């Protein structure tokens, strides 16, 4: 991101970054040599939207002039930490998703024109009793539905007001669940919706089961495909909602429920 913006690291007032590893070790190892103030973020796969929402507030308030929001994930590390080491050779269920090895970062600064963080909704933690670490789409869909409904109610808008409604990594199972939950309340997003977990892989040629997941899934799709769509004039007003399954290696190993959360930011051209 800094290279694209032709900016040195010292131009940043703050780095907001997170990943899926214990103590966000990947993010702080990547940030430590920048010699820039750092705030670690953990929202599971919702981290990119969380960073954009928090970063937008910090820039708008004047607490930071320019900052970087980033998120990353790694397939093998996530499998070892939350499920089984690859050497174990466990069979993945059809509802399982493939953690993306990827990263994305955005630079936020107060400007008079360009792509802006217009609004944000911070999600609430939702627990509907799902405990299967191989079916996180089902665990996260209720949080996505709640956050989106809160946002639409607060802003008095409808799905038709937006060019796209992007979720982070609900995958195939979670996206269908989201449609069902919203349509019970009279909200239809099928025309506007897409999911980063369904976009990032070529699923006709790659066996990733229910799709992609991980902090890097939403971050890398947003910072590549979606930003390109903005630059090319294909979209001007979107909702980016990243969802996170709030589990730890301990809770996962004990078979505890998987609470979830979803944070939403409205990105638009101003």
Regions found by a protein language model. Give the residues of each.
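Short, well-ordered amphipathic alpha-helical segments that serve as non-catalytic structural scaffolds
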Residues: 1-6, 54, 139-154, 221-226
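Short, well-ordered, mixed-charge alpha-helical segments that flank or form enzyme active sites
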Residues: 24-25, 75-80, 125-129, 174, ...
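Condensing-enzyme catalytic core mediating Claisen C-C bond formation in acyl metabolism
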Residues: 85-150, 154-157, 187-208, 234, ...
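Short beta-strand segments
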Residues: 17-18, 67-73, 108, 238-243
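Short glycine/threonine-rich loop-to-helix capping motif typified by GTGT followed
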Residues: 28-31, 170-185, 250-257
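Active-site-proximal alpha-helical scaffold in enzymes
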Residues: 42-69, 108, 213-234
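Long, repeat-rich segments with strong aromatic
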Residues: 143, 149-181
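Conserved beta-ketoacyl condensing-enzyme motif
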Residues: 1-46, 161-176
């Amino acid at each position: 991101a800094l290279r694209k913006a032709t900016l040195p690291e010292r131009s940043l007032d703050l780095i907001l970054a997170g990943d899926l590893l214990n103590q966000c070790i990947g993010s702080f190892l990547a940030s430590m040599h920048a010699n820039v103030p750092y705030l670690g973020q953990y929202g599971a796969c919702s981290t990119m939207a969380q960073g954009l929402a928090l970063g937008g507030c910090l820039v708008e308030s004047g607490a930071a002039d320019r900052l970087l929001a980033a998120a990353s994930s790694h397939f093998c590390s996530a499998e070892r930490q939350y499920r089984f080491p690859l050497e174990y050779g466990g069979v993945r269920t059809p509802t399982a998703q493939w953690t993306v090895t990827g990263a994305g970062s955005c630079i936020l600064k107060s400007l008079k024109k360009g792509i802006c963080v217009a609004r944000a909704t911070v999600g609430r933690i939702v627990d509907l009793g799902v405990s299967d670490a191989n079916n996180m789409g089902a665990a996260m869909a209720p949080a996505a539905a709640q956050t989106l409904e809160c946002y639409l109610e607060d802003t008095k808008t409808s799905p038709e007001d937006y060019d796209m409604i992007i979720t982070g990594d609900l995958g195939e199972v979670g996206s269908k669940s989201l449609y069902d939950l919203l349509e019970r309340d009279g909200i239809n997003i099928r025309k506007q919706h897409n999911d980063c977990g369904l976009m990032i892989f070529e699923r006709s040629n790659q066996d990733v089961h229910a799709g992609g997941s991980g902090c890097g899934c939403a971050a890398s799709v947003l910072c590549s495909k979606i930003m390109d769509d903005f630059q090319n004039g294909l979209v001007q007003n979107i909702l980016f909602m990243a969802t996170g399954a709030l589990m730890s290696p301990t809770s996962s190993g004990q078979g505890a429920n998987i609470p979830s959360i979803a944070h939403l930011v409205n990105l638009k051209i101003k």
